């Protein structure tokens, strides 16, 4: 089975670094029936007391309104791809090595496996790099 790769918009919001800081943002999206496929959150070491959460996807009028209400913004500097395929040893290494060989620098890469499938989200610096990465990954 070939890898499936697609462009995705990543949304980000600042969160309070305290109990409930993340859940407040996610509850706003959940109330609008936004079905998130990817969530990653972390502290902001350069801004004590805050963190950042990245999510995808957000769509539809209700989802977009909820995102705005919760302080989420589409990240114009993150050119993100969603990769899905069979889980097998070395899958992440194959993807990252192919991108490195093509001179594509990754801003970030997160992946997980469930059962016999894996899904990963990666970000690159430019639209051109994302288009190039899509072609490379689709051939793996």
Annotate each predicted stretch with a short phrase.
Residues 1-140:
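A conserved regulatory-domain signal marking ACT and ACT-like small-molecule sensing domains
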């Amino acid at each position: 089975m070939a890898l499936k790769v697609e462009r995705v918009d990543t949304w980000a919001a600042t969160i309070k670094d305290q109990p409930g800081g993340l859940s407040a943002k996610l509850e706003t999206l959940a109330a609008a029936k936004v079905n998130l496929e990817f969530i990653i959150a972390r502290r902001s070491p350069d801004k004590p007391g805050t963190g950042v959460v990245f999510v995808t996807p957000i769509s539809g009028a209700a989802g977009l309104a909820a995102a705005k209400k919760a302080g989420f913004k589409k990240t114009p500097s993150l050119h993100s791809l969603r990769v899905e395929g069979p889980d097998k040893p070395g899958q992440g290494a194959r993807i990252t090595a192919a991108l490195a060989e093509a001179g594509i620098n990754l801003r970030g890469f997160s992946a997980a496996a469930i059962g016999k499938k894996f899904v990963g989200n990666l970000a690159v610096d430019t639209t051109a790099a994302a288009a190039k990465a899509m072609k490379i990954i689709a051939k793996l």
